[in-house]
Amino acid sequence: MDRRARLDGYGVHSQFKTVRTEPLPLHRPRSSLGCDNIDPLGITGTPVIDPSTAAIYLNAAVAEASGPWHRVFALALQDGAPLPGWPVDVTDALRSAGKKFNARDQNQRGALTILDGTVYVPFGGHYGDCGDYHGWVVGVGTTNPRRVTSWSTDARGGGIWAPGGISSAGGELFVATGNTFGASTWSGGEAVVRLAPDLHRSTDKRDFFAPPDWQALDARDADLGGTNPIPLRIETHNGVQDLILALGKDGRAYLLDQHNLGGIGGSLVAQRVSSGPIRTAPASYAIGGDAYVAFQGPGARCPPPAQHSELTVLKIGMGEPPRMTTAWCGALGGVGSPIVTTTDGHSDPIVWIAGAEGDNRLHGFRGDTGEPIFIGGGSNEVMTGLRHFQTLIATENRLFVVADGRLYAFAF
C-alpha cells in the first residue's frame, strides 16, 4: 500500500494553466487504527470522473471525535465544491440497510468504478490484516446518493484491495478477493466474483472462480486479491471469445471463460507466469485478434535476452483452450503499474511504466515487440517521491506522474 495519503484535493489543468486546491478534512492518524503502514490515512483509492455529472467521486478516511469513518464524496469538476447530498457516510448508509460496516477495520485501496449511474467503491483491510474486516463493494447513486447497495464476503477477510479496483464488462462487475481467515468451506475469498449492477451475487459456479488450492493460498497469504480481474476479448474461427484473466500473489495466471467463471478449480488455463508475487494494476491491449496483458512482476518465462525483468507481457490467442504465452519482458527497476497508449485507440500500442521505488524513471516499450523506446533520459529526469503501485495518467500529448508533493509531466 502507499505509505502516504492524499490529504487535499487538487485539480490541475493539463496545460498547467490553473491549479485548484480543495482542502477537505480527509485524514485520520494511524493511532486510530489497529494496524497499517499509512500515516496519516486519507484518500488512497484512485477517484473516478463521471462526465455526465461533471463530478469526481472519491472515498476518504476521516477522523472525528466519534471515531474513524469512511465517506464517499462527489466534487464538482469546475471548482471542487461538494455536490448536494454528499458526502455519504458508509457506516450510516449500511446501518440503515441493516448491515454492519466497521470503518475502523476497513480500508479503501482499489480504484472506484462507475457503471450505469452508480459509483462503486471496493473495500478491504489494513496492512497487517487486523480486526474484523471483510471484502465489500458499496454502490452509491451518482445523482441520488441515498440509493446505496452493497455486497460483502461471508468470511472474515477476503479484502478487495487491488490497485485497479473493480472491473466491468457486458454490464456486469468483476472483483478479485484476498485471503480469508478460518474458513473451512469456501466463503468468498481467493476468488474472482461476478456481481450484478445491484450487487447481487449468484451462488451458481458460473458466477465465481476460486483456485482448487484456495485453502493453501489462504494459509500462505498468496491470494488473488493483489490484482484486479482483466476482461479480454480474442478472435476465434467462429467469431470472438470473452475471457477474464486473474493474476495471483503466487505468481500464477488463471484464464477464465467470462460467461462461465467455472467455480472452484474451473479455469480454462492455469499457468505460472511470474517468479514473484503479482501485486499491480495490469494493462491490456489488442494486436490483431490477440489480447496482450502487461503487469509489473518478474516473468517466469521471459524469452531471451530479457530475463529477470520487472515488466511482463502475456499474449492470449485462439485455441482450445486459448493459448497463453509470455510475449516479451521489459527491463526496469521498480514496482509501478503499467498503462498503454495508442495513436487511435488501437494502433501502435506503447506500454509505459514508472520505476517506482527503484530507478524512479519513466520507461516506454513497443507493445508488439517490447523494444525500449524511452528509458528515463538523463539525470534530470529521475523522479523523486514515487510509491509502489504508482500508475500514470495519459492525455492527448502528455504523460503525468504524481509523486509526493510533485506532479511530473512528459510531452509526447
Tell what function each PLM region has.
Residues 269-273, 298-303, 325-331, 379-383:
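Short, contiguous acidic/charged loop-to-helix segments that flank catalytic cores in large enzymes
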Residues 268, 307-342:
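A beta-strand-loop signature enriched in Asp, Gly, Thr, and Trp
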Residues 1-236, 241-263, 277-302, 309-314, ...:
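Mobile, glycine-rich extracellular loop/lid and propeptide segments
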